[in-house]
């Protein structure tokens, strides 16, 4: 798998980050992976650029499930993220759910690509589930508010649990769920960010095995 052609499209309502995903070991067409962020903070907008971390985190499980030998990303993701993904794959394998070997992550040298210059700050995924809420509580207990690791932003994602089927976007359900989380986020001092992705529309394992 190759992840390349990072881009940004701005509109009055949202900022869309995109990348082209090319399959190497599966007979699947190139696909565009997007993350659409609404109500982005001004300090983030000023330094906006595609982040290799986000695309690697999204594409690594896809590459692993579909039997890609590698995932080559035209960027320089965080080494800690790479180590964490390898660790996660080891867990998946120990649980008996991985039919293929772990894909190797290949990155571009730092000299060949820019390093994000924006402010560093903690961010989390929040769906309202117990695990996410526990993680947020533990983070706020462990770090001081002045620490960059202190979580101040939380992503609520359309296209993951809600709206993961293209034929049924569930926009009203997503809106209600988002609004129900806003008081909780405000109480925790976290800014809740609406994000949409099309990752769930990528090839499903059943189709990939049939094509393979």
Residue ranges of model-derived segments:
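RNA-binding accessory domains that recognize and position tRNA/RNA substrates
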Residues: 1-122, 138-196
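Glycine-rich Rossmann-fold phosphate-binding loop(s) that bind the pyrophosphate
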Residues: 128
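Conserved Rossmann-like nucleotide-cofactor binding loop
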Residues: 131
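Hydrophobic positions on the alpha1 helix immediately C-terminal to the Walker A/P-loop
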Residues: 135
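Conserved adenosine/adenylate-binding substructure
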Residues: 191-212
């Amino acid at each position: 798998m190759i992840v390349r052609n990072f881009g940004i499209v701005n509109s009055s309502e949202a900022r869309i980050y995109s990348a082209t995903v090319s399959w190497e070991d599966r007979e699947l067409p190139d696909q565009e992976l997007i993350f659409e962020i609404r109500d982005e903070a001004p300090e983030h907008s000023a330094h906006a650029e595609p982040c290799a971390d986000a695309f690697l985190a999204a594409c690594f499980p896809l590459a692993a499930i579909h039997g890609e030998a590698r995932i080559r990303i035209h960027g320089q993701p965080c080494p800690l993220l790479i180590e964490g993904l390898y660790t996660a794959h080891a867990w998946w394998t120990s649980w008996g759910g991985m039919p293929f070997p772990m894909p190797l992550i290949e990155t571009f040298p730092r000299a060949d690509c820019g390093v994000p210059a924006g402010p560093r700050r903690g961010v989390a995924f929040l769906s309202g589930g117990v695990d996410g809420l526990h993680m947020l509580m533990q983070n706020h207990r462990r770090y001081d508010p002045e620490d960059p690791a202190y979580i101040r932003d939380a992503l609520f994602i359309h296209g993951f649990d809600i709206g993961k089927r293209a034929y049924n976007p569930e926009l009203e359900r997503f809106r209600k769920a988002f609004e129900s989380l806003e008081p909780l986020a405000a109480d925790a001092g976290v800014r809740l960010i609406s994000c949409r992705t099309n990752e769930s529309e990528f090839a499903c394992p059943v189709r990939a095995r049939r094509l393979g």
